[in-house]
């Protein structure tokens, strides 16, 4: 199931850097994280759904690339983001 418009707007409002910000790295990573968590729950119930698993891996790779970019450009923003999303230990 895709992310609802209301949920996506809620995530955007929480992680946006300024009004109308929908494309910053923080927003993209936050939306991807929600989608990844949702797909993880689906995969736990439907272990043989290989197409969804492939989509999950693609989203994880995209998030990894965005986080690597953010870490190169601004370490402080990277650290704030991963702590707020609870991605690393």
UniProtKB/Swiss-Prot annotation:
UniProtKB keywords: Ribonucleoprotein, Ribosomal protein, RNA-binding, rRNA-binding
GO cellular component labels: cytosolic small ribosomal subunit
Highest taxon listed in the record's lineage: Bacteria
UniProt entry tagged with the keyword Thylakoid: no
SMART domains in the cross-refs: Ribosomal_S15
Pfam families (UniProt xref): Ribosomal_S15
BP terms from Gene Ontology: translation
MF GO annotations: rRNA binding; structural constituent of ribosome
UniProt xrefs under SUPFAM superfamilies: S15/NS1 RNA-binding domain (SSF47060)
Family (UniProt): Belongs to the universal ribosomal protein uS15 family.
Xref: NCBIfam families: S15_bact
Subunit text: Part of the 30S ribosomal subunit. Forms a bridge to the 50S subunit in the 70S ribosome, contacting the 23S rRNA.
Function noted in UniProt: One of the primary rRNA binding proteins, it binds directly to 16S rRNA where it helps nucleate assembly of the platform of the 30S subunit by binding and bridging several RNA helices of the 16S rRNA.
Protein's UniProt name: Small ribosomal subunit protein uS15
Originating gene: rpsO
């Amino acid at each position: 199931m895709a992310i609802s418009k209301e949920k996506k707007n809620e995530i955007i409002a929480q992680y946006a850097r300024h009004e109308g910000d929908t494309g910053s790295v923080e927003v993209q990573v936050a939306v991807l994280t929600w989608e990844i968590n949702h797909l993880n729950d689906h995969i736990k119930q439907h272990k043989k759904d290989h197409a969804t698993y492939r989509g999950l891996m693609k989203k994880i790779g995209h998030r990894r690339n965005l986080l690597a970019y953010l870490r190169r450009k601004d370490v402080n923003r990277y650290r704030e983001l991963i702590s707020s999303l609870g991605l690393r230990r």
